[in-house]
A protein has these predicted regions:
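Secretory-pathway ectodomains
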Residues: 2-474
């Protein structure tokens, strides 16, 4: 039995109100929604009966799980009311979590074998458990690949079986250290049943595998050190396209040093001693950089960026043509809806900069020690170790910030209307605090259950993790 308490946030007081207009802001150019009134929650205690092994509270067992879509990957499904623990399941924190259509998945290696377990999102009941065979002792590629939205009906997993010793009669012909040639098995599973839909095999000096829709994109190293990138269908392993780089990757101490593969709906970015940007649809080369290039990643739809020590950052359009240069770097968003699409946000180290697309005019500059992490509904959430602030994407104006100082021991999350973050009561009890993105007003606050070590988003679901359990809140 577990008590879930809603902390009273009624009345007025300093702890309730956000602090507005913090940080030094310089607007270079100023181009030109209120929500429903704050709902005040009385102190309530909800006693939830939890069945061992992960059953739901009896009152909601028959109810359907709301399936309203998120605005963007990395965001929570809409949180209309204070959430409560819908179910819990035994999952060690060392296991990886991901989501698929109607299920939450845990992957693990137990006794040298790779296993995937699926729990029904609505009930917490175990749907299926699949053993995908033995794995190698070192398994950098082994795992299930999350799809962008966590809603695919296909689960794609890669397993590296134990390495077979090299045949002395066939020594390696690689002229410098490189990853050993090995093979990996790609399995496509039905998310609803766990049934194996198909298996295929990857062979070569494998460096990285990423998922793109229901396909896999594979980076391998040719015997002469050149990168090879291929896109295969996860079901059946059919080749979509193949690319070989003109420049060898940088190799060191038997590994591919600094190599990286990034994918999104528009681009495939291959980074090593040089950088190449490929069209995700057909593998055609959009641009290939000099050996001094460093590929940062896609920034927005149809726009990507590169960086070099000599030129700094360069923003490029869909064809690879240079739009403008900037010494600022490109922030790593945990969630973004890319709105508005004609404003690019850059991190200049000690300040955040807004620039227009496609011309690159500087619109505003905000001096802050906090880092941009969320971009949604025309607003930025900038996070520091002691709190966060919300700024307008078009103007750079700081709209509000969290009152006081609270250790952000987990990264703030959003559903597009609320920002959920770490909070603390006057007595020091850790809480989950929900503030309206529009104005910072506190809507509710929930105590964090004992033993919780992480609060995160998995496929749009709010998930808490202890050392040996997961708790799904709804």
């Amino acid at each position: 039995m577990q008590d879930v308490e809603l902390v009273d946030v009624g009345g007025t007081g300093a702890a309730r109100d956000p602090v507005a207009l913090a940080g030094r802001h310089r607007r270079t150019a100023r181009p030109g929604r209120s929500r429903t009134p704050l709902r005040r929650w009385a102190v309530v205690s909800l006693t939830v009966m939890l069945v061992a092994g992960g059953a739901v509270g009896a009152g909601l067992a028959a109810g359907g799980y709301p399936a309203r879509p998120r605005a963007a990957a990395g965001m929570l499904h809409p949180v209309d009311d204070p959430p409560w623990t819908r179910w819990h399941a035994p999952v060690p924190r060392s296991d990886d979590l991901l989501a698929a259509d109607g299920v939450l998945l845990g992957t693990s290696v137990r006794e040298g074998r790779f296993r995937v377990t699926a729990w029904d999102v609505a009930t917490g009941g175990r749907r299926w458990d699949q053993d995908l065979g033995p794995v190698a002792g070192t398994r950098p590629l082994t795992g299930c690949l999350p799809d962008r939205d966590g809603t695919s009906a296909v689960v794609v997993c890669v397993v590296e079986p134990p390495v077979v010793p090299t045949d002395p009669a066939r020594p390696s012909t690689v002229p410098f250290p490189a990853p050993d040639e090995r093979w990996a098995r790609v399995s496509a599973l039905d998310a609803a049943t766990g049934a194996v839909l198909s298996t295929s095999t990857l062979v070569g000096r494998l460096a990285a595998v990423e998922r793109l829709a229901d396909d896999v994109v594979v980076l391998s190293i040719a015997p002469d050190g050149h990168p090879q990138v291929a896109r295969y269908s996860a079901e059946g392993g059919h080749l979509r396209w193949w690319y070989r780089g003109d420049e060898p990757l940088r190799l060191r101490s038997g590994i591919v040093s600094g190599s990286e593969l990034r994918v999104d709906d528009a681009f495939v970015l291959v980074q090593g001693w040089s950088a190449s940007v490929l069209d995700a649809a057909d593998g055609s080369v959009i641009t290939t950089g000099t050996p001094q290039w460093y590929t940062i990643g896609a920034l927005a739809q149809g726009v990507f960026g590169t960086w070099s020590s000599g030129q700094g950052g360069t923003v490029r359009d869909r064809s690879g043509a240079e739009l403008f240069r900037s010494s600022a770097l490109f922030p790593s968003f945990t969630a973004t809806d890319q709105q508005p699409p004609d404003v690019l946000v850059l991190d200049s180290g000690g300040s955040v900069v807004g620039r227009s697309l496609p011309d690159g005019d500087e619109l505003w500059r905000l001096d802050t020690y906090r880092a941009v992490r969320l971009r949604v509904d025309g607003k930025l959430v900038l996070v520091g170790v002691d709190g966060y602030q919300v700024a307008d994407v078009r103007t750079g104006d700081v709209l509000w910030q969290t009152p006081g100082r609270t250790l952000m021991w987990w990264a703030p999350l959003t559903d597009g209307r609320l920002v959920l973050s770490a909070g603390r009561t006057g007595s020091g009890t850790p809480t989950i605090e929900a503030r309206r993105l529009a104005d910072g007003a506190l809507e509710w606050s929930l105590p964090v259950p004992d033993g919780v070590r992480a609060v995160t988003e998995v496929g749009g679901h709010l998930v808490l993790r202890t050392r040996d359990e997961i708790l799904l809140l709804q």
